[in-house]
Amino acid sequence: FQAYQKVARYANLIIAVSTTDADYLRKQFPNQRIEFVPCFHENNRITAEPGKSDYILYHGKLSVIENERAVLFLTKHVFSQLKHTCIIAGMNPTRLIREAAAPYPHIKVEANPSKERMDALIHNAQIHMLITFQDTGLKLKLLNSLFAGRHTIVNHLMLAGSGLDPLC
């Protein structure tokens, strides 16, 4: 982000996708026009399924370092301590993710699910467990979980600048 600041000072308009980013940019560039534009997403109504299911879900692109870090943390400190089925689903899970989950029969890694399968996992999960270690704006997986899931548990960085705090 800081690498782009040298160029951003010449912009006529800077658009931020989180209120945190907009506030930061307004301080960095007080003479620039900074606008907050909420994230676009495909959800237009709540589609959460009624009832209960028997698993906790983490989903994301698992080859991304930030997501790998989140999964490794959840596996070691949360999922390993539970008795409930925990599903880690997403594209291209790393070797580290697979190895971390392997000793625990109740933790399942679902690699490269189809869109239909991922939608089913999201809709049917009892709990969505989403954490991040970077406050890099609104996460689409958070929006998808809130629109399509039953319950969502997140850490404070997942909500940073999103305005969604009351929903989690």
Give names to the regions the model predicted.
Residues 1-14:
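Membrane-proximal helix-turn-helix segments that form the acceptor-binding/catalytic region
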Residues 20-22, 93-94, 152, 158-159:
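Alpha-helix capping/helix-boundary segments
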Residues 156-168:
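Short acidic/histidine- and often glycine-rich active-site loop of Leloir-type glycosyltransferases
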Residues 141-144, 148-156:
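Short hydrophobic beta-strand element within catalytic cores of glycosyltransferases
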Residues 27, 35-123:
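Conserved catalytic-core segment of nucleotide-activated headgroup transferases in glycan assembly
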Residues 12, 123-137, 148-151:
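Acidic donor-binding loop of glycosyltransferase active sites
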Residues 4, 115-119, 142:
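Acidic, amphipathic alpha-helical patches
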